[in-house]
From Swiss-Prot:
NCBIfam families hit by this protein: glgX_debranch, PRK03705.1
GO function terms (MF aspect): glycogen debranching enzyme activity; hydrolase activity, hydrolyzing O-glycosyl compounds
Species name: Escherichia coli (strain UTI89 / UPEC)
Taxonomic classification: Bacteria, Pseudomonadati, Pseudomonadota, Gammaproteobacteria, Enterobacterales
Catalytic reaction(s) noted: Hydrolysis of (1->6)-alpha-D-glucosidic linkages to branches with degrees of polymerization of three or four glucose residues in limit dextrin
Listed name of the protein: Glycogen debranching enzyme
């Protein structure tokens, strides 16, 4: 039997050099590490890793080739109170594996035990890692490097975006390949999108609880192999990486960036009753935040929390991010529950991972977007991330909905959010683009559901409608659910138009949820993470072409307004913005706080957004000059040239002079 050579301690993972494969694994508390390789018949062969450099275990297997399936058995103490849960009866996934063979099914053998170890061997059913070799012709691919001030983000799910698209070949719908299909690229270009932000594509598992209910984790925020692509989105799992890179290359040729939603805050091992896949059995004490009683700090709501204050875990996370940039040419990341990245355990801007990203010549050059909170005390950190990061701006989301749907927000508060929330983000040299403005996202109501439902309807999730937020700031306009009279449909349409206009013509970086431009509904489900079905798949055959055209016109209008594209904070007298009342006069202090919801926003001295958010038709006197309504607002209801606008209830219009 071939013996392992000592090999070398870097890089982490399994790497083929043309003659064999070098294997490395971090574990600070292991006493022994076995590399387990499996032949074509499934027969297991075990090798002790002979090299031990600091906390890195390593070995080199001569004559090993790509396609080899492997895993690890890690020996060490079973001391739950101290956070140690080693169990060599369980085959473990390499945290840096780039391909996985097998499925993560709900099976008792994939659990290590809670108080006492489960010593039943699981190699026969455990997923295996696969050694891969990386050869890919990027041709002349180059990152679009779209300036932040010109960025329009489109948040989408790989499968849900194209699975029902009638113009995309059936055999590739819902896959990575479909993302790069000319039909999809042309659609994104016509819409005006500059960045496609994808929900997680790193391999994830469905929670055992969901599997028992016949459901699955659809969104993908339950990672199990952070370097491996989720195989279900590939036409062929063996070619997933090339399919993904083909799509990125095609999108780049069209000038569209690709941003990945990535989960560095927890793993699919969940709480101590959850499955054992990898980190818990490799070095539980190092990889996770452990309480004094040996249980996990659950700062994510998912059962465990990755310890990104540990230098080795920071190295792992940094290597993961570099992999996606260097190997797949992605243009940036959106970090789920990103406050975890800065925990020491207190949140700090100079936390190790933030510093590593800032000092990395690769990662410091890509777009970085934080979901700036977690569920721990002190977890709400909006505005507090390092300058390299942009952040999801929930202040904008809530303000836009409250202003147009609940009618309870003063003009001053609305204007503050419209102006990139400078009270939150104008610090440490940050620019307006640091505010990622959104009205909706994958998490919550769709835009159509915001105007059709007062209450969530999550019964299909199997939790008796307890899951999902109750703070939706939605308005069904008098009838719960879809459909209704022509008047009801028109009022809902007007509210959608108002929200889209606020999103796409405000200062900051706009993010549009895929399907909102269609009128997509999830029938009131505001937490559709486990709905891999027609509730979440975009139905292109039912898309509202009028709403899509309205959205595209807004995006193209945005690109004509210097005040929105120059990415500079608005200052008094700089000509970027003037805030006027219904008589075209500057608003008084009282009007800002207590005045009627009527406002004129003059941008770049040529573009005017006239707003009447009251219940009555109101005459709005425009500033001096010859004004004409412009697409998508020009039409029968808005005269071509006017000095006075008859503003309908809850209406708005954009003019140019």
């Amino acid at each position: 039997m071939t013996q392992l050579a000592i090999g070398k301690p870097t890089p982490l993972g399994a790497h083929y050099d043309g003659q064999g494969v070098n294997f490395t694994l971090f574990s600070a508390h292991a006493e022994r590490v076995e590399l387990c390789v499996f032949d074509a018949n499934g027969q297991e062969h075990r090798y002790d890793l002979p090299g031990h450099s600091g906390d890195i275990w390593h070995g080199y297997l001569p004559d090993a080739r790509p396609g080899l399936r492997y895993g690890y058995r890690v020996h060490g103490p079973w001391q739950p109170a101290e956070g140690h849960r080693f169990n060599p009866a369980k085959l473990l996934i390499d945290p840096c594996a780039r391909q996985i063979d097998g499925e993560f099914k709900d099976n008792p053998l994939l659990h290590a035990g809670h108080n006492e170890p489960d010593y039943r061997d699981n190699a026969s059913i455990a997923p295996k890692c696969v050694v891969v070799v990386d050869h890919y012709d990027w041709e002349d691919d180059a990152p679009p490097r779209m300036p932040w001030g010109c960025t329009i983000i489109y948040e989408a799910h790989v499968k849900g975006l194209t699975y029902l698209h009638p113009e995309i070949p059936v055999e590739i719908r819902g896959t990575y390949k479909a993302l790069g299909h000319p039909v999809m690229i042309n659609y994104l270009k016509q819409l005006g999108i500059t960045a496609l932000e994808l929900l997680p594509v790193a391999q994830f598992a469905s929670e055992p609880r969901l599997q028992r209910m016949g459901l699955s984790n659809y969104w993908g925020y339950n990672p199990v192999a952070m370097f491996a692509l989720h195989p279900a989105y590939a036409c062929s799992p063996e070619t997933a990486l090339d399919e993904f890179r083909d799509a990125i290359k095609a999108l780049h040729k069209a000038g569209i960036e690709v941003i990945l939603d990535i989960v560095l805050n927890h793993s699919a091992e969940l709480d101590l009753d959850g499955p054992l896949f990898s980190l818990r059995g490799i070095d539980n004490r190092s990889y996770y935040w452990i309480r004094e009683d040996g249980d996990y700090h659950n700062w994510t709501g998912c059962g465990n929390t990755l310890n990104l204050s540990h230098p080795a875990v920071v190295d792992y996370a940094s290597a993961c991010l570099r992999y996606w940039v260097e190997t797949c040419h992605v243009d940036g990341f959106r970090f789920d529950l990103a406050a975890v990245m800065g925990r020491t355990p207190e949140f700090r801007q100079d936390a190790l991972l933030f510093t590593a990203i800032q000092n990395c010549p690769v990662l410091s050059q890509v777009k970085l977007i934080a979901e700036p909170w977690d569920i721990a005390p002190g977890g709400y950190q909006v505005g507090n991330f390092p300058p390299l990061f942009a952040e999801w701006n929930d202040h904008f989301r809530d303000a836009a909905r409250r202003f147009w749907l609940h009618y309870d927000l003063p003009l001053g508060a609305f204007a503050g959010r419209f102006a990139a929330s400078s009270d939150v983000f104008k610090r440490n040299g940050r620019l307006p683009s640091a505010a990622i403005n959104l009205v909706t996202a994958h998490d919550g109501f769709t835009l159509r559901d915001c105007v059709c439902f007062n209450h969530k309807h999550n019964e299909a999730n199997g939790e008796e409608n307890r899951d999902g937020t109750n703070n939706n700031y939605s308005n069904n306009h008098g009838k719960e659910g879809l459909g209704g009279t022509l008047d009801l449909v028109e009022r809902r349409r007007d509210s959608i138009h108002a929200l889209l206009t606020t999103l796409l013509l405000s200062q900051g970086t706009p993010m549009l949820l895929a399907g909102d431009e269609h009128g997509h509904s999830q029938r009131g489900n505001n937490n559709a993470y486990c709905q891999d079905n027609q509730l979440t798949w975009l139905d292109w055959s039912q898309a509202s072409s009028g709403l899509t055209a309205f959205t595209a016109a807004l995006i193209h209008l945005r690109k004509r307004i210097p005040a929105l594209m120059e990415n500079r904070w608005w200052e008094e007298g700089d000509g970027n913005v003037r805030w006027l009342n219904r008589y075209a006069q500057p608003l008084s202090t009282d009007e800002w706080q207590n005045g009627p919801k009527q406002l004129q926003i003059l941008l770049s001295d040529r573009f005017l957004i006239a707003i009447n958010a009251t219940l009555e038709v109101t005459e709005i006197v425009l500033p001096a000059g010859e004004w004409h309504a412009i697409p998508p607002f020009a039409g029968e209801d808005n005269p071509v040239i006017t000095a006075v606008w008859q503003g309908p209830a809850h209406g708005l219009c954009v003019f140019q002079r």
